[in-house]
């Protein structure tokens, strides 16, 4: 099978392998995109566009409640009253329980895409870049991250909206339209280097350093409510501070990971980044 691997240490590419694939081809990041979502949330809070990670999302994107029975991705998936209290922190930490009746916000770790879509739409709406009446008309969350993150770190990635093949009554304009990034391994390495340096790029603070520190440890919601084997996720990152996900690796390591073997593994104590991205 084709594969691409890049190792960077001390700010330089140490090794790069490209087997039966073009190193310049951009690959879909799938859920690895969610770590960039996290960074953009940190930026939005720093800029005062969003007040706090603990703000109710309905105050910014009330449309999230406009999904009745028969309008969700499946028959039993709909917005229910407790969803009104969902916070930004719960969305990025996959503990929101969005459209999952029986899951109270902040109590259950359930890795899902639709809650992340609510996150990106709510942030983009706060910047006046997304509307459910015409989802593809505005600049969108992807363009926002180009402005705030990609361009400052001299990246070259692109993005597009992605949707699952759902039934015709599904309100995808509310909970669909996933912002999917396409990156080369070197783009992925740029993201990793930004995170390793706590959001700083050549002296410019692109993402708040405190946010990176905060997002790359297992969230308190998971620590307080889930068994130890689930103590693996922070705010948009897979985290090893509890030693559960990679027991033999340094506790300060963390990663962005997505389907198709898209991975950006970061280890600050080793000043090391490892990227895997099949072509």
Where does each model-flagged region fall?
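Flexible glycine/proline-enriched surface loops and loop-helix/loop-strand junctions
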Residues: 22-24, 101-105, 116-117, 124, ...
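Active-site SXXK
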Residues: 11, 28-53, 119-123, 188-191, ...
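Solvent-exposed loop and edge beta-strand segments that line ligand/cofactor-binding
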Residues: 25-29, 80, 103-111, 174-182, ...
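Flexible, glycine-rich surface segments
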Residues: 160-223
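Active-site-proximal alpha-helical segments within enzyme catalytic domains
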Residues: 115-122, 179-200, 262-278
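Active-site Gly/Thr loop motif
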Residues: 162-165, 217-273
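Active-site helix/loop module of the DD-peptidase/beta-lactamase fold
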Residues: 28, 47-98, 128-178
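A short, well-structured edge-of-sheet supersecondary motif
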Residues: 1-22, 264-265, 271-275
